[in-house]
C-alpha cells in the first residue's frame, strides 16, 4: 500500500490462465473433462490428497471464447486460483500483503503412473522435507520407565523415533515447570541414545468453550464445524495455544509434533476474537496462523505428522489413506487392507509422504483378534506388517508400549529393519504399480530409480493358501535400463535378461502360500 490510508482487500484472483479445452461438446455435460494441468497451492486443507485438499483452483467458463463448440459457451477452460472466502485483509499505509502461492505442473501424458510420478517429483522439489522418512514407534504411555524401555528397544532394533501417542497422557499445553522438567528429562535420555522423540497434540475436533470455539455463521453459536466443534485459531485460546506449544518445544527439546486435525478450514462468525475481525477474514487469518506455526517448526527441524495436505506449508507426512475402524478387524484382514492402502496411497504420494498403522495393542476395538500383543504369539502377522510396510517404503505408526517381548520377537524386528535400511534408497524411491492386491492372485509393486546401483526393487505377495508359480511381466522402463538387466531373487545370484521392445521382462516367479518374494534389479 503506497497510499496514506488503509486498504481493505476483500478478495483476489491470484492466477487466471486460459487453456485449450479438454473436452469439446455441443451440449453441456454434468462433469466436464478438465485440462491436463496439475495445480498445487500452499492454501490447501481438509484433505489427504491434492484433489481433496484443493481449495483454490477453479475451472470456469470463458464467455469471450465465442468460437467454442458448446452452444451455451459453458466449456470450462479458464483456470482461476482464488480463496473460497476473503481474505478481507487490511493493508496499512506502507504495508504489504502476500497471497498464497500457486504451482502449476504440465504433465506430458495422461497415463496415471507417469502423471503420478511427475506429481511426486514436484512435491519432492517443492517440499524436500517430505522425503524424510524415519522409522517410529507410537508409544502409548509417558510413564518414565516405559519411555526409557522404549528408547532402549528402539536402539536395539534400529528404530529412529518415538511419538508419544494419543492416550499416552502427554499434554504439550501444560508448560508448568514440573511437566517441562519431567519431559525434558525423557527427551534428554532419548537424545543421548540417538533417538528423536516428540508427541501428539489435538487441535481440531475439540470444544474449548463458547467464547473460543468457531462460531457458526448460520446460528451465531458454536457447533456445525467441519468436525463438529473446533476452537478458533484467532480466539484468545487459539493464540495462547500456539504460544504454549512454542514454549514447550523450546524448553523440552522435543523433535516431533503429531498435530491431529490441524486446521481444516472452519470459518468463524465471531467479532470478539482478537485474531480476526469477523466472518470474511476468519478463514484466511486462521490458515495464516497455522502456516506460520508450521514454518516455525520447519525452521527448527521439528518433524510434523499432520493428517492433512500441509506439505507446502511445512508438514512432513500425512496419512497414507485408511479408515481407522479397519484396524479393529481380524489380523489377516488388516494385512490385506493395509497392503491395498499402501498400493492406492502411493499414486500421488511418494512412499515417504504417507504413514500407515499397525495396532500392536487394541486401537478402537476388535479385542485379541485384532492386535499383535502378545507379540511373540503373532510373529507371522508382525512379520507381514513389517515386510509390506518397509517393502513399500512407507512407515507405520507401530502403536503400543514396546517393540518386542522376547528374543525371537527382537530378532524378527531387527532383521526386517536391517533389510529396509540396507535397501533404503531404492525402497524410498518411486513406485510402479504392477498389480493391485485383491486376495485372489499375486500382487506386486516395483520401486524404480535410474540414479542408483539398484535400478529396481520388485516386491511380490501371495495372499492365497497355495503356492503360485507363474511368469510375471515386469515393466522396467522407469528403471532407466534399455537393453539388459541383472535380476536376483533376494540375496541370490543374478540372472541376465534382455529387455523386450516395451522395456519389460518376463520373470518366472514362485511365491509361497501367504508369503512374499523380492527381487533386486541392476
Regions found by a protein language model. Give the residues of each.
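Active-site groove signature of glycoside hydrolases
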Residues: 160-167, 242-275
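Conserved structural scaffold segments of CAZyme catalytic domains across common CAZy folds
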Residues: 1-213, 396-440, 450-456, 463-470, ...
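Alpha-helix-loop-beta-strand connector modules within alpha/beta enzyme cores
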Residues: 183-195, 282-302
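Active-site-proximal substrate-binding groove within the catalytic cores of carbohydrate-active enzymes
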Residues: 290-493, 508-510
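Active-site-adjacent "subsite" loops/lids of carbohydrate-active enzymes
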Residues: 143, 183-188, 192, 196-254, ...
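The substrate-binding groove and active-site-proximal loops of carbohydrate-active enzymes
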Residues: 133-144, 165-180, 223-242, 274-286, ...
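Solvent-exposed beta-strand/loop surfaces of large extracellular or lumenal domains
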Residues: 69-80, 484-506
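C-terminal beta-strand-rich structural cap/linker in extracellular carbohydrate-active enzymes
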Residues: 498-522
